[in-house]
Amino acid sequence: MYGERGRNMVSSEFLSMKTIKEVAPHLVPVPIAWGTYETLNDVRFILCEFRNMTDELPDIEAFPAQMAELHRNGTSPNGKFGFPVTTYHGNTPINHGWHDTWEQYFTNTTKVLLQMEQEAQGPNAEILDFSKRLFEKVVPRPLRPLETDGRSIKPALIHGDLWHGNIAMDANTGQPIIFDAASFYAYNECETPRVLFRWSLRAGRTRCVAPALEQDQRALSSSVAQSFPESAARGGL
């Protein structure tokens, strides 16, 4: 990782890993330091403890239980959704800020990511038409009921970029390890909604906030939002 962007990437990953470590000590390698090479003054690094890892996937019950514990115990310092620094999805910056509601956070950050995607790939009338309906109708329908009519959700610390490439097993302890974090305080359902949250529900480690019937729509909205930084960094939707 190079230059100013590389500096921001390693420093935000260090803060993400450090924040997770404070809540779930055994779930991540200990983050030790980040900085710049003395002899390569434009090259950045992040240093974590060595953990002997295997590429096996974790147990379907044990891993969701540990992630659900992270979500329960990782509380936002100001009660809001967001994160104090910009994190990165690959090379794409995610400018979180702080927001009072999950709908507000999701809408604002997704709009910025869509704009970045369009700048990277060029304007696309079909996507722009879709995005108008996405923000006016699709997003409010499953998200707004979470925080209306007396309902509320608590911002939870999440890994932020969880997929099988960022999960391993400790060869010595047999326990799951997660790394390459890009954390923020979110609605916990958005932590890989199609995989981890369903595992957690099946294992009885977390519960689906009412209205439960909208859970699939919320998962789909999160999946759509996650496709924008992928497209901005790579080859299009």
Spell out what each predicted region is.
Residues 221-230:
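Hydrophobic alpha-helical segments that form the core
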Residues 11, 129, 133, 200-203:
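Conserved phosphate-coordination/catalytic loops
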Residues 233-237:
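ATP/Mg2+ or Mg2+-diphosphate-binding catalytic cores
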Residues 98, 102-104, 111, 115-116, ...:
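Active-site Asp-x-Gly
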Residues 59, 124-127, 216:
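Residue-level recognition of alpha-helical structural elements
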Residues 1-104, 108:
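ATP-binding pocket architecture of kinase catalytic cores
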Residues 36-39, 75-159, 170-173:
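An alpha-helical support segment within catalytic cores of ATP-dependent transferases
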Residues 15-18, 140, 209:
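Short, well-ordered amphipathic alpha-helices
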